Amino acid sequence: MKGLVFLLGLLPTIYASLVHITPASEDDFYNPPAGFESAKNGDILKLRNSPNRLASFYFPIDVKNAWQLLVKSEDSFGNPNAFVTTLIEPYNADPSKVVSYQTWEDASNINCSPSYGAQFGSPLSTITTQIDMTLIVPPLRSGYYVVTPDYEGPKATFAVGRQSGQATLDSVRAILKSGSFSGINEDAKVALWGYSGGSLATGWAAALQPVYAPELQKNIVGAAVGGFAANITAIAESVDGTIFAGLITLALNGLANEYPDLKTAFYEELSDFAVPEFKAGAENCLAENIFHYPLHQYFTGPKRAFEKGWGLLKEDIFNKSIQDNLLIGLNKTYLPQVPVLIYHGTVDEIIPIKDPHAQYQLWCDWGIESLEFAEDLSTGHLAETFTGAPAALAWIDARFDGKTPIQGCSHTTRLTNLLYPNTSDSTHSYFLGIYQAVFGTPLGPGINGDNITINSGLLGLVSSII
């Protein structure tokens, strides 16, 4: 039995080694057409069916449709760009409800983009996207359309808040114009959701919306942010020298992709021995970089990569780019106008809870209309990904159902966010969704759970290999 389980666990890796899907960097679809600069932000520049089936933890999922859209947007400086967003239609979809899910891509290479990593047959390097896809399955089971944008944009600007938030909003604009092929209503309700790196994009989208996309306020019913990345400097301080140290070179390269002068400055300050791993951070996806560089010290310790230590980040060229990307550094103009849920583990080992606390207090002091903080006393960053998901799903369901959100601010602590109100159905949906994805059940409401298709789940994986 153990041998069978081991073999089944290897099947996704075996399949990925046998199939080749075109990386984003080699796919012309990602390149905007001539003259795209004149298009409006949120316009659809290109459209195609997903080149391959989508997968959840490397098992192909059965959905009615999946499209890729190339969407017009702009970078942090107002320069036009274009990014890909993936739109998924479940069976028996409700055209009035869409979840915009921002993945924790956390990488500075376009070949780590969710539009590529979510495809069946994507390489093992994109495993974090495949894990993240397990969170997309429950909304699909509920009949919600799901859109997941490559919010880091064509330059893969991990940790760059404005680019990430704007792309998230332009993705929403695009899908609200997609009715001719997707069936989505122009006045559809949209819930934003993201965890960890995805919370950075989601939080910035909620903050930028009143200024960047004011017309979307009538559509966006709320934003759920978990493992809330409000302060990127504090995250670097938290992970330097720990098993998660590889996050640092990913984030620094992401910032440097948006600020070219920053990359030159980083290399001038790097110790010679650290240059190869800094370059690797520009190529690796999240899991690979974490695996290769645990316990490395970049700003602390006697053999740190940057001799100046944390003092380096106080120098003008570094400090400005970092300050530009601190959500907590925005002024009151960017107070979210939609309900917000923050869910976070008290003992989060990557994103210290003091920073989500500070962001919560700031927004409350500014008079936010609805802000709920669900603190989980028992979990760290990784565990809260999954124990907090049912709370986010229950909260999103309530927003779609038109239930009145928290008025003003509310901060609650629980032993676990699995005890969040009305999570029994969403917890069941989450774990049943994993089961159904593995065994190939079509995703959508009113679907017979025994209706397994040969092209999806475990059977689809085996048949593809055979």
Curated annotation (Swiss-Prot):
Enzyme class (EC, first level): hydrolase
Matching Gene3D superfamilies: 1.10.260.130, alpha/beta hydrolase
Entry-linked Pfam families: LIP
InterPro entries cross-referenced by the UniProt entry: AB_hydrolase_fold (IPR029058), Lipase_secreted (IPR005152)
Subcellular location, record wording: Secreted
Keywords: Disulfide bond, Glycoprotein, Hydrolase, Lipid degradation, Lipid metabolism, Secreted, Signal, Virulence
Disruption phenotype: Exhibits reduced host lethality and fails to persist in infected kidneys. Impairs host immune evasion and leads to exaggerated IL-17 responses that lead to fungal clearance from solid organs and host survival.
Catalytic residues of the enzyme: S196, D348, H381
Signal sequence extent: 1-16
Function: Secreted lipase that is able to hydrolyze both the neutral triacylglycerols and the monopalmitate ester Tween 40, allowing the use of hydrolyzed products as carbon sources. Has broad lipolytic activity, which may be important for colonization and subsequent infection, therefore contributing to the persistence and virulence in human tissue. My be important for alimentary tract colonization, but not oral infection. Facilitates invasive disease via lipid-based suppression of the IL-17 response.
Protein name: Lipase 2
Gene source species: Candida albicans (strain SC5314 / ATCC MYA-2876) (Yeast)
